[in-house]
Amino acid sequence: MRAFGARIHAVNTSGHTTEEVEFIGTLADLDKVLAAADVLVLSLPLTRATRGIIGDRELVLMKLTAILVNVARAGIIDEGALYEHLRANPDFSAGIDTWWHEPPLGEDFRTDYPFFGLPNVLGSPHNSAIVAGSQAVAARHAAQNVRRYLRGDSPAGIVRREDYAGR
């Protein structure tokens, strides 16, 4: 996004990042970030803390001309609230790469709301992670974590199982 001249404002659970951003906050800063965003890109895990974090109240905080892009997990957004917001606000747009009912291989895709009937929605089949070099990057990160472990250091990116249990 920076290549397009974007100023990056981010929130996460810690309020810290090693990434180059103009602002980093915690989930307590989410309302402020939503109100200022021209483009909101969701790329966070679905945990107890993030399930349904974007609902009607949060969508109303956003600019009427904002673009919401979800490349994370569908459950982060209230499906009905997003559909109604898109329907009622034609200048608000969404790029949706992850869906609320993702079918097992060979089964039909379905939605509870007719998103594809809206002119302000662009959908893709949950394949945004498939980009050139992504598997090599993942393999490199895994190898670096093995190296850390073998040296007696803590691996990077450790998650707490209890944050995900009973999602």
Q: Predicted regions span which residues?
A:
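Surface-exposed amphipathic alpha-helices with a cationic face
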Residues: M1-R2
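N-terminal Rossmann-fold cofactor-binding loop
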Residues: G5, A10-G15
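Glycine-rich NAD(P)-binding loop of Rossmann-like domains
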Residues: G5, F23, Y164
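General small-molecule cofactor/ligand-binding pocket signal
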Residues: H9, G25, L122
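Generic signal for short, ordered secondary-structure residues
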Residues: N12-T13, V41, V121, P125
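Rossmann-like adenosine-cofactor binding region
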Residues: S14-T111
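Rossmann-like dinucleotide-binding domain for NAD(H)/NADP(H)
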Residues: T65, A72-R167
